[in-house]
């Protein structure tokens, strides 16, 4: 459960760095383009995390480097660190167990299943905004405590893996048996720009739970991981928090049992910190002065640390053994009567009025206090459905332990994608449905098999449009955020993907490809679907006068329906796919922005997006067979006609609907309608950056380059989920 400081209610601003006034003449200063045009298309989102920002270079292989790691020694060092209390940030009860669990939780807890973004997979807690979120107060200290260990092991362990492993080791050190740990999270070197954290301009702005279902947001307030621990909008009412808790945990794909287990398990250890009013707390790390060296929230209250620490403003210790695993959370929750009170900082919390003083003080062994809980902890007792689960865990501690172990593993690995990406000696053998499991390959097609399959596909009567469209439909579900989707598994043939409106082509094409599969009884349908795209593109390139062999990596397998979580895969259904000129809803951003969103999920660069759209238009791959954007008189030929005709000044474009979504291109002299288009087409002529790219492919000398670039980008998309090739 998230804890937060409710006094951080405005965006942080650092002090002016100028000593003598005047204008800032440094690079990047001054009024920017987005200041003038705030709705400017974010093409820059496709350029983040390039090799230009990576100090390790493009040849660095994290999996190879991790294989050199002394994993046992690393865990030993982490265990020793847990009780190595530092005077600059003393450990509660002499242990950093609670702090490291919170660090791992808050790193993973930003994940949202609706768009697959967020999570712990990139080590984003090092960067703004997460490093300075109100809910992450004092986690800068946790990361700084880990630095000597990171320094020792260098690139053999990423920050992203280290954060989660530290949380696991903390749990194990408390006596808890975890479900396992999978490494494989690779660091990035700059903040993620694509994650939509919300449009609020003030920290802790309240959001209604119903609104969370309509947007890719994971928390009920800007700057929180989950919910306000004082109740919705500081209501102090446990029962009113139930909807918010379900909404936020549900956005991570957690059900009620997993939610109860995570809240209770996370609050079995450690404490919150609210020694005094938040007015004593200084600037967050991003706004702190340069001499603070990346640390923030310096406190002027007392020593500012230890017993005087202020983190969330709440002062809660849940259990009698805050550094050792127990079932005391549930025992205390149901054993005592709880009355609303306030922390020394003024935050709303609850105290067990009829309990003896049984909670140890974190720094004075001679002192004890009554059990305390957050408003949202009591939700587990007063919400009828949560209460049933909580009472079961109260009476069956082993069931609670098992549920928390699995839920914690899911929380910390949810954004890693299939288990093929996991590395390390503690990867669990069990396949879990949320990992989108795949069967083991039974057969690897030979080169002769591939030649015969291509011949069968070519002779099947399928059109170029159908072959290319079905391959794209299969592969384009991939999401770079949580590594879900893609062509491996042939889930296009399963529910729910086979029934999506955007995949209408599958109903016509898959039966043909399935018949071809039956004749071989060896190759997977997943491989055959991708191979159909290969055949279609090679035919289209040949028709354009370019002979090219499209690379194909066999080895895909076919998933079963029972390996496919229909509810979770439903989240992969696109709101829009500009590559196929598909748009389901008009109430979510602009068509061109959603094209950028889709391209970013597919990890495409701006040039790759541009060449793919141009190629797919002339191949006639619109989801509904429309002629929108098909700026060619020779469909099925892999030509540069899309770009040449879009940029041709003979045509004038005007909208044909009130929403400005559909357009006609008329001959300026005759008034004749030559082409029709959507915003996903015209953006390549209207946006200055995309027009510059389109001009490259519209030039007379670009034909062969266009085909080669299209094939390279196409193969990239087809192989995005081939983690078996790593």
UniProtKB/Swiss-Prot annotation:
N-terminal signal peptide: none
GO-annotated biological processes: cellular response to hydrogen peroxide; hydrogen peroxide catabolic process
Protein name per UniProt: Catalase-peroxidase
Free-text cofactor note: Binds 1 heme b (iron(II)-protoporphyrin IX) group per dimer.
Subunit-structure text: Homodimer or homotetramer.
PROSITE patterns: PEROXIDASE_1, PEROXIDASE_2, PEROXIDASE_4
Cross-link (Tryptophyl-tyrosyl-methioninium (Trp-Tyr) (with M-252)), chain numbering: 105-226
Gene: katG
Residues of the active site: 106
Reaction it catalyzes: H2O2 + AH2 = A + 2 H2O; 2 H2O2 = O2 + 2 H2O
Record has Iron as a keyword: yes
Cross-link Tryptophyl-tyrosyl-methioninium (Tyr-Met) (with W-105) placement: 226-252
Organism of this sequence: Salmonella schwarzengrund (strain CVM19633)
Family affiliation: Belongs to the peroxidase family. Peroxidase/catalase subfamily.
Alphabetic keyword roster: Heme, Hydrogen peroxide, Iron, Metal-binding, Oxidoreductase, Peroxidase
């Amino acid at each position: 459960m998230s804890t937060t400081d409710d006094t951080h209610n405005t965006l942080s601003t650092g002090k002016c760095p100028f000593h003598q006034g005047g204008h800032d003449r440094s690079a990047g200063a001054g009024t920017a383009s987005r200041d003038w045009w705030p709705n400017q298309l974010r093409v820059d989102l496709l350029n983040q995390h390039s090799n230009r920002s990576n100090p390790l270079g493009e040849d660095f292989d994290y999996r190879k480097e991790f294989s050199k790691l002394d994993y046992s020694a690393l865990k030993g060092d982490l265990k020793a660190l847990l009780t190595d209390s530092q005077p600059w940030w003393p450990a509660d009860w002499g242990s950093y167990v609670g702090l490291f669990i919170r660090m791992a939780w808050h790193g993973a807890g930003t994940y949202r299943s609706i768009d697959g973004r967020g999570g712990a997979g990139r080590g984003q807690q090092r960067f703004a905004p997460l490093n300075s979120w109100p809910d992450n107060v004092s986690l800068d200290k946790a990361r700084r405590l880990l630095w000597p260990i990171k320094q020792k092991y260098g690139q053999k362990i990423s920050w992203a893996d280290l954060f989660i492993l530290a949380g696991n080791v903390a749990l194990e050190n408390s006596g808890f048996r975890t479900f396992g740990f999978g490494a494989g999270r690779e660091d990035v070197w700059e903040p993620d720009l694509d994650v939509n954290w919300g449009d609020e301009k003030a920290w802790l702005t309240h959001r209604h739970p119903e609104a969370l279902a309509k947007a890719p947001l994971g928390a009920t307030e800007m700057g929180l991981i989950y919910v306000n621990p004082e109740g919705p909008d500081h209501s102090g009412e446990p029962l009113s928090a139930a909807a918010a808790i379900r909404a936020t945990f549900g956005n991570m794909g957690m059900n009620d049992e997993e939610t109860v287990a995570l809240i209770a398990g996370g609050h079995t250890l450690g404490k919150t910190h609210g020694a005094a009013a938040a007015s004593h707390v200084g600037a967050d790390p991003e706004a702190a002065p340069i001499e603070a060296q990346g640390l923030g929230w310096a406190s002027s209250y007392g020593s500012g640390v230890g017993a005087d620490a202020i983190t969330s403003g709440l002062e809660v210790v849940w259990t009698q053994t805050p550094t050792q695993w127990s079932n005391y959370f549930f025992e205390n929750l149901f054993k005592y009567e709880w009355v609303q009170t306030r922390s020394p900082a003024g935050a709303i919390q609850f105290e067990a009025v009829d309990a003896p003083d049984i909670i140890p003080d974190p720094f004075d062994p001679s002192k004890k206090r009554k059990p305390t809980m957050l408003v949202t902890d009591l939700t587990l007792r007063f919400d009828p459905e949560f209460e049933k689960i909580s009472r079961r865990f109260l009476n069956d501690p082993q069931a609670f332990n098992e549920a928390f172990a699995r839920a914690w593993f899911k929380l910390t690995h949810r954004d890693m994608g299939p288990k093929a990406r996991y590395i390390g000696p503690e990867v669990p053998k069990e396949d879990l449905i949320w990992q989108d499991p795949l069967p083991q390959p039974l057969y690897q097609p030979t080169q002769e098999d591939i030649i015969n399959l291509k011949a069968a596909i070519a002779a099947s009567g399928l059109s170029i449009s159908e072959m290319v469209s079905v391959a794209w439909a299969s592969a384009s579900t991939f999401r770079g955020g949580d590594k879900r989707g893609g062509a491996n598994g042939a889930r296009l043939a399963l529910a729910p993907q086979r029934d999506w409106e955007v995949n209408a082509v599958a109903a016509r094409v898959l039966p043909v490809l399935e018949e071809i599969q039956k004749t071989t009884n060896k190759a997977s349908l997943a491989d055959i679907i991708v191979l159909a795209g290969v055949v279609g593109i090679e035919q289209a390139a040949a028709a354009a006068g370019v002979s090219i062999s499209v690379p194909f990596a066999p080895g895909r397998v076919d998933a079963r329906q029972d390996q496919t979580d229909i509810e979770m895969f439903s989240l992969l259904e696109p709101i829009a796919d500009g590559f196929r000129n598909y748009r389901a809803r008009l109430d979510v951003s602009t068509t061109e922005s959603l094209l950028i969103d889709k391209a970013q999920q597919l990890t495409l660069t701006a040039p790759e997006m541009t060449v793919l759209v141009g190629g797919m238009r002339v191949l006639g791959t619109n989801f509904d067979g429309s002629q929108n954007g098909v700026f060619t008189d020779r469909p099925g030929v892999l030509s540069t006609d899309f770009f040449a005709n879009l940029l041709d000044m003979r045509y004038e474009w005007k909208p044909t609907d009130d929403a400005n979504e559909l357009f006609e291109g008329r001959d300026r002299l005759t008034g004749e309608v030559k082409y029709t288009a959507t915003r996903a087409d015209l953006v390549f002529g209207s946006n200055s950056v995309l027009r510059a790219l389109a001009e490259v492919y519209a030039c007379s000398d670009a034909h062969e380059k266009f085909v080669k670039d299209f094939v390279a980008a196409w193969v990239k998309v087809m192989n995005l989920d081939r983690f078996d090739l790593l």
